[in-house]
A protein has these predicted regions:
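Proline-centered loop/turn at the N-terminus of a beta-strand
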Residues: 106, 179, 250-252, 268, ...
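Active-site-proximal beta-strand elements of phosphoester/diester hydrolases
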Residues: 179-184, 294-295, 335-339
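Beta-strand-turn-beta hairpins that frame and shape the catalytic cleft
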Residues: 175-180, 288-291, 329-334
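RNA-binding accessory domains that recognize and position tRNA/RNA substrates
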Residues: 1-212, 216-217, 231, 344, ...
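Catalytic beta-strand/loop cores that center a nucleophilic Ser/Cys/Thr
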Residues: 290-331, 369
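Cysteine-nucleophile active-site neighborhood
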Residues: 216, 220-221, 225-301, 346-364
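A glycine-centered loop/beta-turn motif at secondary-structure junctions
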Residues: 326-368
């Protein structure tokens, strides 16, 4: 079946349908990973977005239940050059096409994803729609196309954290030694895995849990997860964080957790032209002088110059564009990073940051004795 991608600027790409059929509207972004496509699709950070994979062949090792980063696909749509129909891997359970259909996700293949990526790089991320219902390039469909364009241009990702967070607390590895509260702003499962394999008890809490609720759990440490959307939108979460930091419990923030912490500290965030989405982003650490290759999934960044000097300092920057990638706080017992040390997919070069966080937890427990 034919499928079409209609961008907010009026451009039309014609291809073939993959996954579910119908119409879906979202923010069109691109991700540069060669692998990790299942993790990308199920990452809540992509809530409200249509993902373009820049690598030309996607789905070649298939899909399975173990590589899920949440229990469903959060992306609004999926764009690939070619969707592999004959995946080969001993862990493979189904094809990309069947996985998309099972999750009612509309996709398109057979378009020039290289050209589309260049458009996004030059013009910035823009809204768009994938549809199988009519050809928007056909003059006979002018009225339908104009109506859809109006819908595309009015689209905005809103209430992202509210829509992806958990409804109630959940405990993992209850016999673990260090008790870590993980704030769920759109949490990937591998954050939980990284903590559990280090012997931690993990209590995942809804995004809007208050400082009083956190304190009642008597945690040894707090983690602030990744997540989607404009970090300045969930004002209640930001205000809660100010009170959570006053508990003086060792805290480690990732991605959206990094941005929310900076906003709570009085800094500002900005929307990037086309974001950082992929597994090959270089980050330079000021303290060590080393540059690490990291996995990233964000469209916003902290404005490092806006961080009050008495609150903290920028600790890492992106080696490509100089944007803030990490903050070490002075007033709070906290450090945060914009990238994903838990990876999945991507390099695990910075997974040692979990160990650094747990060393802070151990030091705080020892001091409290």
């Amino acid at each position: 079946m034919n499928a079409y991608l209609l961008l907010a600027n009026g451009m039309v790409f014609a291809g073939q349908s993959v996954g579910a059929q119908g119409v879906t509207v979202g923010e069109v972004v691109f991700a540069t990973g060669m692998v990790g496509f299942q993790e990308t699709l199920t990452d809540p950070s992509y809530y409200g977005q249509i993902i373009t994979q820049t690598y030309p062949l996607i789905g070649n090792y298939g899909m399975n239940k173990d590589d899920m980063e949440s229990d469903r696909i959060w992306a609004k749509g999926y764009i690939v050059r070619e969707a592999c129909t004959t995946p080969s891997n001993w862990r493979c359970e189904e094809t990309l096409d069947s996985f998309l259909k099972k999750n009612n996700t509309i996709g398109i293949e057979g378009i020039d994803t290289r050209h589309l990526t260049r458009i996004i790089r030059e013009s910035g991320v823009m809204n768009g729609a994938i549809l199988t219902t009519f050809d928007p390039a056909d003059p006979a469909n002018k009225a339908e196309t104009e109506a859809l364009l109006a819908q595309i241009r009015a689209y905005a990702v809103t209430d992202a954290v509210k829509n992806v967070t958990c409804e109630k607390p959940e405990v993992f590895n209850p016999q673990g030694e260090a008790h870590i509260v993980l704030m769920h702003y759109g949490c990937k499962r591998n954050i939980v895995r990284c903590l559990v394999k280090r012997g931690c008890k993990v209590t995942v809490m809804p995004a809007f849990a208050t400082a009083e609720e956190i304190k009642a759990l008597a945690p040894d440490g707090i983690m602030l997860s990744n997540g989607p959307g404009d970090p300045a939108e969930p004002v209640e979460v930001i205000e809660n964080l100010k009170h959570i930091f006053e508990l003086n419990i060792p805290t480690f923030g990732i991605c959206l957790g990094h941005q929310l912490s900076a906003l709570a500290a009085g800094a500002k965030t900005m929307k990037l032209k086309y974001g950082h989405r992929g597994a090959n982003q270089p980050v330079t650490d000021f303290e060590s002088g080393r540059t690490f290759i990291t996995s990233q999934t964000h469209g916003y960044a902290v404005v490092g110059d806006e961080l009050p000097a008495e609150m903290g300092e920028v600790a890492q920057v992106n080696a490509n564009d100089g944007t803030c990638e990490g903050i070490k706080y002075k007033k709070w017992n906290c450090f945060t990073v914009q990238f994903h040390p838990e990876a999945n997919g991507g390099p695990k070069d910075t997974e040692f940051l979990f160990d650094r966080f747990l060393n802070n937890v151990k030091a705080a427990k020892k001091e409290a004795r």
